[in-house]
């Protein structure tokens, strides 16, 4: 099953997350199918902290991908900011 979830990157104490479509059997930070966006919780005011490709996210949802609870919250937040 395909899931859309966060893959952690960045350094110690400085998290950075890629929003990825991946097979549920793969590790959290392992192989993924496609990068759909990113989330930077430590972003400064002048930087973009959240970027989501809504078109690709919708594509994966239509093809049966399950969103993790955090990605669902972030997707709603990104849609609200874009509107």
From Swiss-Prot:
SUPFAM superfamilies: Ribosomal protein S16. The keyword Ribosomal protein applies. GO terms for molecular function: structural constituent of ribosome. Pfam families: Ribosomal_S16. One of its GO terms (cellular component) is small ribosomal subunit. GO terms for biological process: translation. Keywords: Ribonucleoprotein, Ribosomal protein. PROSITE patterns: RIBOSOMAL_S16. The keyword Ribosomal protein applies. InterPro entries: Ribosomal_bS16 (IPR000307), Ribosomal_bS16_CS (IPR020592), Ribosomal_bS16_dom_sf (IPR023803). Belongs to the bacterial ribosomal protein bS16 family. HAMAP family: Ribosomal_bS16. This is Small ribosomal subunit protein bS16. It comes from Aromatoleum aromaticum (strain DSM 19018 / LMG 30748 / EbN1). The gene is rpsP.
């Amino acid at each position: 099953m395909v899931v859309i979830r966060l893959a952690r990157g960045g350094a110690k104490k400085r998290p950075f997350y890629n929003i990825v479509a991946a097979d549920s059997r793969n590790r959290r930070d392992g192989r993924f199918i496609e990068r759909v966006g990113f989330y930077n919780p430590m972003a400064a005011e002048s930087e973009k902290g959240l970027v989501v490709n809504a078109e690709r996210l919708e594509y994966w949802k239509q093809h049966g991908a399950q969103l993790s609870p955090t990605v669902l919250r972030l997707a709603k937040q990104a849609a609200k900011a874009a509107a």
